[in-house]
């Protein structure tokens, strides 16, 4: 990816860390709402949905295109949901200056299905996925680890981050439930016109 200048921003947990890119050290700066993104062409954001929503205006108000890796904007009609191999042209219509990408499972699936769709229109796909607890964040992973210990030690299992015990179990939930009892993840497709 061609880069003239690289700026790294992060949370208090990441601020101050140093990363090497093309032989040069870059320090992560603390992202704040008054940061100025003038002159920034593209901002890749992968800090979770709440951070994406909180800083979207800060990032885009001077023309930067925000490519968001969270679920924050996936259901928004005025934010294109793009998988470049399938619908790159949708990235050109971004009224809010934001481009979202679908869940990783969806991305892999639609890339594989695009050539089939070109040969014979697909009417419906039923998919079952098994998502990792890590997708729910560090606190959820800590809970899973603690639940595993509790089960193995014969202790009562404490549940906090998930609706049910996750250790040695599968629960029928991915993402946040909507009013019709489906989850947002079930609605992510590669194009807003197909949502």
Where are these regions (language model features)?
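N-terminal Rossmann-like NAD(P) cofactor-binding subdomain of oxidoreductases
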Residues: 1-166
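Short acidic, gly/pro-rich beta-turn/loop elements at beta-sheet edges
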Residues: 137, 178-180
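ATP phosphate-binding P-loop of adenylate-forming
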Residues: 169
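Active-site pocket-shaping loop/turn-to-helix segments
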Residues: 180-186
């Amino acid at each position: 990816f061609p880069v003239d200048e690289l700026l790294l921003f992060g949370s208090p947990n990441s601020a101050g860390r140093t990363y090497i890119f093309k032989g040069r050290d870059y320090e992560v700066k603390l992202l704040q709402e008054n940061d100025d993104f003038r002159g920034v062409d593209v901002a890749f954001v992968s800090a979770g949905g709440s951070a994406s929503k909180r800083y979207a205006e800060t990032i885009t108000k001077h023309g930067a295109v925000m490519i968001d890796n969270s679920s924050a904007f996936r259901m928004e009609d005025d934010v294109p949901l793009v998988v470049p191999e399938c619908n790159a042209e949708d990235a050109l219509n971004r009224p809010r200056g934001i481009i979202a990408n679908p869940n990783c499972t969806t991305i892999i699936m639609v890339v594989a299905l695009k050539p089939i769709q070109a040969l014979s229109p697909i009417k419906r796909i039923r998919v079952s996925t098994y998502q990792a607890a890590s997708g729910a964040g560090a606190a959820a992973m800590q809970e899973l680890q603690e639940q595993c210990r509790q089960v193995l030690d014969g202790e009562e299992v404490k549940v906090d981050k998930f609706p049910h015990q996750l250790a040695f179990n599968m629960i029928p939930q991915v993402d946040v439930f909507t009013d019709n009892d489906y989850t947002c993840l079930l609605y992510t497709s590669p194009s807003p016109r197909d949502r």
